Amino acid sequence: MSRHVFLTGPPGVGKTTLIQKAIEVLQSSGLPVDGFYTQEVRQEGKRIGFDVVTLSGAQGPLSRVGSQPLPGKPECRVGQYVVNLDSFEQLALPVLRNAGSSCGPKHRVCIIDEIGKMELFSQPFIQAVRQMLSTPGIIVVGTIPVPKGKPLALVEEIRKRRDVKVFNVTRDNRNSLLPDIVAVVQSSRT
C-alpha cells in the first residue's frame, strides 16, 4: 500500500499549485503538515531564480541566474542558475528534521517540493529525505522531475519504492488529481 505521494511532470504544469491545494485540504482535515516548496522569482517578467518557502513562512534564495557562489564554497550550477546551498540548507533541513522528530502517535505530513537537481547538491538533504521516507508516522508529499538525461539516484530510488504512489501531472489531469492525492494520504493514516 502506498504511504507517500510524489507528483511528477514537466516544469510549469502545476505540480506546486497542486501541492499547495493539497496542503489546504490536509490541514483543514486536522492533519499536521510541515515542509517547504519552491517558487519562481521574477523580475520585470523574467524568471531570475527560485526561492525556498517553508510552510511557516520563512523564505530565502535557492538559486539565481548568474549569481556568484559564496567565497570558499564550490559552485553548484544547474543551467544558468547558481544554487545557494547554504540558504537552502538553513531553511529546508530544520523543517525536515522537525517534521521527523515531532512524530508522536499521530501521523504527520511532510511536504518536499521539490527533490530536483538543485536540491540534490545537498548531501544532508538527501540523507534527511531518506530518513523521512523511512520514519513511521511520516507521510511525504513531494515533487520529483520527469526523467531526462542522466538519472538522479535519489529520484529513481523514490520511484522504485513500493510505498510510493507517483502521479504524472499533465495539463489535462491537473485539475482532477487533488481528490486522488488526498485519498492516498488519508488512507496512509489507517
UniProtKB/Swiss-Prot annotation:
Transmembrane segments: none annotated. This is Cancer-related nucleoside-triphosphatase homolog. Keywords: Acetylation, ATP-binding, Hydrolase, Nucleotide-binding. Coiled coil: none annotated. The modification N6-acetyllysine is found at K165. It catalyses: a ribonucleoside 5'-triphosphate + H2O = a ribonucleoside 5'-diphosphate + phosphate + H(+); 5-methyl-UTP + H2O = 5-methyl-UDP + phosphate + H(+); CTP + H2O = CDP + phosphate + H(+); ATP + H2O = ADP + phosphate + H(+). ATP binds at residues 9-16, 109-116. Monomer. Pfam families: NTPase_1. Has nucleotide phosphatase activity towards ATP, GTP, CTP, TTP and UTP. Hydrolyzes nucleoside diphosphates with lower efficiency. HAMAP family: NTPase_1 (MF_00796). SMART domains: AAA.
